[in-house]
A protein has these predicted regions:
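A structural feature that tracks compact, well-ordered secondary-structure segments
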Residues: 7-9, 15-23, 28-34, 43-47, ...
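Short arginine-rich
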Residues: 48-56, 99-108
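Charged, low-complexity amphipathic helices and coil/IDR segments
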Residues: 2-4, 104
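Short Pro/Gly-enriched beta-strand edge/turn motifs at strand-loop
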Residues: 1-2, 53
Length: 110
């Protein structure tokens, strides 16, 4: 079965971040900024571990009533968050896509 991949990149300010990309090329999870590449790589490892378990996801709403979700580690720290969706059903599908792709070991540095 085809799986997505992680894109690890340097932000404009020199910090590091990553996206989890689905098989269709869509960004399905975006990390916070990390001061070091090693810290970002640890973040990816945390998504690989925690992103396969539905209990680690939390659904939220923006002020304009757009649903999105965050992925949390076992220590309750946020690891990544989704885009904003048009419906709760779409956000649910996004979460399922993260769960299906999180365990990929493919990391592309861009």
């Amino acid at each position: 079965m085809a799986q997505g991949h992680y894109e690890l990149k340097t932000a404009k300010d020199g910090q590091f971040m990553f996206n989890l990309i689905a098989t269709n090329g869509q960004v399905i999870l975006t990390s916070e900024l990390y001061k070091t590449k090693a810290a970002a790589q640890n973040g990816i490892a945390s998504v690989q571990k925690n992103g396969v378990d539905e209990k680690n996801f939390e659904f939220r709403m923006t002020k304009s009533d757009q649903p999105y979700f965050v992925l949390k580690a076992t220590n309750h720290q946020e690891i990544g968050r989704s885009q904003y969706y048009s419906s709760q059903a779409a956000a649910q599908k996004g979460m399922e896509s993260v769960m299906n792709n999180a365990s990929t070991e493919v990391i592309k540095e861009i």
